[in-house]
Amino acid sequence: MVLVSGLFTCAAVAADQNATPFKLGTFRDHGREFLGLVLEDTRVIDIAAANKAFERAHPQAPRVRPPAQMTELIARYEEDIGPRLRQLAAANAGAGSAGYVHAIASLDVLPPVRPAVILNAGANYPEHAQGIVEQAARAAAASGGAGGGPPGGPGGAARQAAVSKPGLWERSADDPRPDNPYLFLKSPSVMVGANDDVIVPRGREEIDWECEFAVVVGRTAKDVTVADAPNHVFGYSIEFDVSDRENRGDRKMGGGPDWFVQKNHDTFAPVGPFIVPKEFVPAPMNTRHYFTLNGEVKQDSNTNHMEYNIWEMLAYASNVMTLRPGDLISMGTPPGTNIEKQNPRWMKPGDLGVCVVEGVGEQRHHIVAQP
């Protein structure tokens, strides 16, 4: 049975019924980067240029300084940027030919934000975690060893019941979930855009997919409660958590997973294409996401299968480090990855991987060999 806290499933801020929905991104047009407001996934409004035109046409409107980067936009969203973006979206809702309106197909789509921190949830979909355990047991049985997964990992032979850890994660006495939340760091330096190539590193063959729903932090968060965590969410995006499943060739640190090697090759963190402000995502804990490889569905799940929900994971992360506007928390991957399979089919040069989160966006990646 998958447990998701029901207390906060309606915590997303309801959008004004009359508001024009929009998404946000960072784009490049002939070498010039700009922040864009995206309408209907097809048109991109240059925020700075549109704001200048709006203030010329409405001399009595408050003057709003355009943000220089997405982290600034996020930090100022509730102050002055959000109201102005809603005005710009409404003013450009109809088809128009203003010079600040671009067809998205004519632009380079960059990662929407440059976060200081990317956190990824591990084994947050129980079916995925169980698949890893079962495949580890099959592999161990075939080799005559003991199964149960890597030391300290899901299904470890010496696994004990999870206990409360004050200051880190405090469990209620009746919480039946077998583990506490689990997060690891991924370097922002390996982030690429939603349409960029994913590079298979030289000598590595076991390259896996993980299509994930990502949370964008909106306010500085440190030691926040689960109840207050929704107030620290700005919106939602996508991370394609590309993973190298090959070992490192030794038994250092007990032979357990090396997250640096597995998760941090160049291009292994595609993010975007957009960030959707939370008021336009009415049910973040009931959102379908799926992955296809060369048109074949490999993953197809829903955020309601998570073991720990968005707000629990944000609160947990804030117990360890200070989160700031624009930081990302990727919420883990559903079942269907190669690490769960007896006969894996790894990604290889020539493949096309597509990661979709409904209502948020789509990533399309050609898999290529390292030059």
Explain the meaning of each model-derived region.
Residues 285-303, 317-325:
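Short beta-strand/loop turn elements enriched in aromatics
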Residues 16-34, 38-53, 266-273, 304, ...:
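Charged, cofactor-coupling segments
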Residues 16-27, 55, 59-297, 368-370:
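Active-site microenvironments in enzyme catalytic cores
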Residues 188-191, 262, 300-308, 323-334:
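Short, basic/aromatic beta-hairpin or loop at an interaction surface
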Residues 11-15:
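Boundary at the C-terminal end of the N-terminal hydrophobic targeting segment
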Residues 309-347:
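A conserved acidic, glycine/proline-rich C-terminal tail/linker
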Residues 1-9:
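Bacterial N-terminal signal peptides
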